[in-house]
């Protein structure tokens, strides 16, 4: 049904909706006009952040979407973020800020994985919330994350839906009970941790590097810095047909190359650097030897030039250039430009100055992509835009060479290389764990307590899980597990064999497992004196079974595979000579009990050592329980002692 409103299905795509509450307008045309005004206000309000942002594939955009199938008319946007996941989380920040700036708007956001906000906060979700019942429950309201809960008991809260709500039902609940549906502090903290630092974080995600580029590309990037993303993607996703256009360059001749500074996102820079590529000899692009100080600048420029040439080769040689004048002819452009001026987008620049025109060009381009016709055929492709700029922008190669002599220093790219310690720190920050005290790694390893391993494993084994699988203990302070001993022994009676007055059936009834379904249903029961005596006798029988099994296994290879405690002294012969136990145990030592903790720790350490520093079952299981083993130093190469 449309009312469930399943969103993004395309890979690496995020979709977002903004609803107006209360929605009292009955006139669809009037409602459309209201929402169009909101789109204009939102884009202009956040233009200082959105316009200069370099998007991996598609920018943040909003358009009017009419009501259909019970879903009211709303503002809708879709962005393909590709390999740069930071684009998606920046959009989450923008959506959060929109609902904060405009309290009458409610937003929901999903990607092709579904409710990815819940995935981010998976460690803190209530047990009832799962992918099957989370539809239309997660919204942003007043700048805060809200989750519409399910009723814990039938009839507890009449306004809570027992099934996933429809969009109209969800909007009504948010309107009437916005304070009661606020997500828990831990869930909100997990999401806020992911978007912490914006908008300042935008600058931290950029990387400036020197590139040896044709003059035409330098001029284009001065006017449209965001086109670097399209060029990198064209090179990164090239195929043999694309490279045919790069055998002989027709648009960007290598003879016109000059040094310039290019701003990438870190994702784009990494994509460009990590690919090995040898240009065709006929292209005219020659690289200096790798030892040359400017080798990296030449290599980056060569790759980027191939991307721009591929983009231009996909355009018709006679494409219409009338599209470039359609931006300022749009009826929305005048009001959009006026709103930009009111929001101090131009930062007090003098109208007509070079910097003013540069920001105006960026605004026109963003208006075309995000406001006027984000999915229209009138929108120019990147290649058409590049060719249009080459035809309309005058540039002087000599002036560009003078600018090349005074370039700002490029950024250090050491962030491309991560040490194991830095990787561990990033993983800990990703799950919200930080070391509160500055203890050296050597001190931690020396003071490491192996009992933490055994205690964590015991807690895991003691946790009663459901049919959905094993559950890791969430907190050490969790209540102890209750246990129905009577039901447990009845269960073992059927496993070990029937009593003389019982049938020989090996089948277990469904009710025999009910006591093991959930730790919430198990509890101690009070027994009558007769029942307690019977229970004690059953326990004694079970112990005798286990003792006999131990004696039989004591002389096999199985017993040698375990580490035992110190051997127990031989049983005194002066005890009751008529005892039945003397027949099998006289003159022999009682089998020493297995040291469970020592065996557990030694087996885990052996498994951890065999991982050779890679991921494996031992480290994965322990880390999921919050136990971090120190590095295995036994296999590290050590320097040989020198002779005096």
UniProtKB/Swiss-Prot annotation:
GO terms for cellular component: cytoplasm; cytosol; nucleoplasm; nucleus. Residues 431-447, 524-534 have a biased composition (Basic and acidic residues). Residues 503-523 have a biased composition (Acidic residues). Residues 567-577 have a biased composition (Polar residues). It comes from the Eukaryota. InterPro entries: Ecd. Residues 430-449, 496-537, 567-589, 623-644 are annotated as: Disordered. Keywords: Activator, Cytoplasm, mRNA processing, mRNA splicing, Nucleus, Phosphoprotein, Transcription, Transcription regulation. Changing residue 617 to G: Complete loss of interaction with DDX39A. GO terms for biological process: fibroblast proliferation; mRNA processing; positive regulation of transcription by RNA polymerase II; regulation of G1/S transition of mitotic cell cycle; RNA splicing. Residues 439-644 are annotated as: Transcription activation. Disulfide bonds: none annotated. The modification Phosphoserine is found at residues 503, 505, 518. Changing residue 489 to A: Decreases transactivation activity. Interacts with TP53, MDM2, TXNIP. Interacts (phosphorylated) with PIH1D1. Interacts with RUVBL1 mediating the PIH1D1-independent association with the R2TP complex. Interacts with RB1, RBL1 and RBL2; ECD competes with E2F1 for binding to hypophospshorylated RB1. Interacts with EP300. Interacts with DDX39A. This is Protein ecdysoneless homolog. The gene is ECD.
């Amino acid at each position: 049904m449309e009312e469930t409103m399943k969103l993004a299905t395309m890979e690496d795509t995020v979709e977002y909706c903004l609803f107006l509450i209360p929605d009292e307008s009955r006139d669809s045309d009037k409602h459309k006009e209201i929402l169009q005004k909101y789109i204009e206000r939102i884009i202009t309000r956040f233009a200082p952040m959105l316009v200069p942002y370099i998007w991996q594939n598609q920018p943040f955009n909003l358009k009017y979407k009419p009501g259909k199938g019970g879903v009211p008319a709303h503002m809708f946007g879709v962005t393909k973020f590709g390999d740069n996941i930071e684009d998606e989380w920046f959009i989450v920040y923008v959506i959060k800020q929109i609902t904060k700036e405009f309290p009458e708007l409610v937003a929901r956001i999903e990607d092709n994985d579904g409710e990815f906000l819940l995935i981010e906060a998976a460690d803190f979700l209530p047990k009832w919330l799962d992918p099957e019942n989370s539809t239309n429950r997660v919204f942003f309201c007043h700048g805060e994350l809200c989750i519409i809960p399910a009723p814990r008991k039938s009839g507890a809260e009449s306004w809570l839906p027992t099934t996933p709500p429809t969009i109209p039902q969800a909007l009504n609940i948010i309107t009437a009970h916005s304070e009661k549906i606020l997500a828990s502090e831990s869930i909100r903290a997990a999401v806020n941790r992911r978007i912490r630092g914006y908008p300042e974080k935008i600058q931290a995600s950029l990387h400036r590097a020197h590139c040896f580029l044709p003059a035409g590309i330098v001029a284009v990037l001065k006017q449209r810095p965001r086109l670097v993303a399209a060029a990198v993607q064209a090179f990164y996703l090239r195929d043999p047909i694309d490279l045919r256009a790069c055998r002989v360059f027709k648009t960007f001749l290598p003879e016109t190359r000059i040094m310039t500074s290019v701003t990438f996102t870190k994702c784009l820079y990494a994509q460009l650097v990590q690919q090995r590529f040898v240009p065709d000899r006929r292209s005219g692009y020659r690289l200096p030897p790798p030892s040359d100080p400017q080798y990296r600048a030449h290599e980056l420029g060569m790759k980027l030039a191939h991307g721009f040439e591929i983009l231009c080769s996909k355009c018709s040689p006679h494409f219409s250039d009338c599209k470039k004048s359609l931006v300022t002819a749009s009826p929305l452009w005048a009001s959009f430009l006026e709103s930009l001026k009111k929001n101090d987008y131009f930062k007090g620049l003098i109208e007509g100055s070079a910097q003013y025109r540069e920001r105006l060009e960026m605004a026109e381009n963003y208006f075309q992509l995000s406001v006027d016709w984000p999915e229209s055929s009138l929108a120019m492709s990147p290649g058409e835009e590049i060719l249009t700029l080459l035809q309309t922008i005058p540039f002087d190669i000599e002036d560009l060479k003078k600018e090349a002599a005074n370039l700002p220093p490029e950024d250090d790219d050491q962030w491309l290389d991560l040490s194991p310690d830095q990787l561990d720190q990033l993983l800990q920050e990703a799950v919200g764990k930080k070391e509160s005290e500055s203890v050296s790694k050597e001190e931690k390893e020396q003071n490491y307590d192996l009992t933490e391993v055994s205690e964590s494993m015991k807690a895991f084994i003691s946790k009663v899980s459901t049919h959905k699988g094993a559950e890791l203990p969430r907190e050490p302070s969790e209540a102890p597990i209750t246990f129905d001993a009577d039901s447990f022994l009845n269960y073992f009676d059927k496993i070990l064999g029937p009593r003389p007055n019982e049938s020989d059936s090996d089948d277990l009834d469904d009710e025999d497992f009910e006591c093991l379904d959930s730790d919430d249903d198990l509890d101690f029961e009070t027994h009558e004196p007769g029942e307690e005596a019977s229970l004690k006798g059953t326990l004694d029988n079970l112990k005798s079974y286990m003792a006999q099994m131990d004696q039989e296994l004591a002389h096999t290879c199985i017993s040698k595979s375990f580490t035992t405690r110190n051997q127990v002294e031989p049983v005194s012969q002066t005890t009751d000579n008529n005892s039945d136990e003397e027949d099998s145990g006289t003159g022999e030592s009682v089998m020493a009990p297995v040291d469970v903790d020592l065996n557990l720790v030694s087996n885990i350490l052996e498994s951890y050592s065999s991982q050779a520093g890679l991921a494996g079952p031992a480290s994965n299981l322990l880390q999921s329980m919050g136990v971090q083993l120190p590095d295995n130093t036994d296999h590290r190469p050590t320097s040989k002692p020198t002779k005096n």
